[in-house]
C-alpha cells in the first residue's frame, strides 16, 4: 500500500462568510407603512397577484381606494399608523375579511375585483 494514503493530510479550506452565517427568520419581519393607502395597495397587489390579474393593478388600487367609504379608509390609515409600533398582520387579515363580506352599494369596481379572488 502506498505510504501517502496511510496518513492523510487535512488542508484548510477557505469558505465564504455567507456559509457560516445563520439564516434570518423571515416570519418576524414587520413592515411599516407610511399611510393607509400604501397598506391597502400592498394588500390588494397580493390579492391581484394570486388571481393573476395584473393589468393596471396600481390604477385599480387607486380607483378602489377612492370609492371606499371614509370610515373604511380611516380604518386602513389607523392600521398603517399602528404598524409603526407593532405587528399588524392579524388586524390586516381581519379588516380584509370585513371588506370581502361587505357589499358596497354603487361600488361595482370594488365588488368585481374582490369577487374574483374569493
UniProtKB/Swiss-Prot annotation:
SUPFAM superfamilies for this protein: HMG-box (SSF47095)
GO cellular component terms attached to this protein's record: nucleus
Localization annotation: Nucleus
Matching InterPro entries: HMG_box_dom, HMG_box_dom_sf
DNA-binding region, residue intervals: 29-97
UniProt keyword terms in alphabetical order: DNA-binding, Nucleus, Stress response, Transcription, Transcription regulation
Induction / repression: By nitrogen starvation.
A biological process from GO: positive regulation of transcription by RNA polymerase II
MF terms in GO: DNA binding; transcription coactivator activity
Keyword hit for Nucleus: yes
Superkingdom: Eukaryota
Function of the protein: Mating type proteins are sequence specific DNA-binding proteins that act as master switches in yeast differentiation by controlling gene expression in a cell type-specific fashion. Required for conjugation and efficient meiosis.
Anything else known: There are three genetic loci for mating type genes in S.pombe, mat1, mat2-P and mat3-M. Cell type is determined by the alternate allele present in mat1, either P (plus) in a h+ or M (minus) in a h- cell. Mat2-P and mat3-M serve as donor of information that is transposed to mat1 during a switch of mating type.
Protein name according to UniProt: Mating-type P-specific polypeptide Pc
Naturally occurring in which organism (per UniProt): Schizosaccharomyces pombe (Fission yeast)
Taxon lineage: Eukaryota, Fungi, Dikarya, Ascomycota, Taphrinomycotina
Amino acid at each position: 500500500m502506498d505510504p501517502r494514503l496511510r496518513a492523510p493530510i487535512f488542508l484548510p479550506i477557505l469558505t465564504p462568510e455567507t456559509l457560516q452565517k445563520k439564516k434570518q427568520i423571515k416570519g418576524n419581519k414587520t413592515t411599516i407603512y407610511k399611510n393607509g393607502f400604501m397598506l391597502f395597495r400592498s394588500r390588494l397587489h397580493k390579492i391581484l397577484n394570486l388571481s393573476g390579474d395584473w393589468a393596471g393593478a396600481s390604477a385599480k388600487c387607486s380607483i378602489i381606494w377612492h370609492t371606499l367609504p371614509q370610515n373604511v379608509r380611516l380604518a386602513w390609515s389607523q392600521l398603517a399608523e399602528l404598524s409603526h409600533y407593532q405587528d399588524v398582520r392579524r388586524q390586516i387579515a381581519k379588516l380584509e375579511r370585513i371588506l370581502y363580506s361587505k357589499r358596497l352599494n354603487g361600488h361595482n369596481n370594488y365588488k368585481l375585483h374582490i369577487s374574483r379572488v374569493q
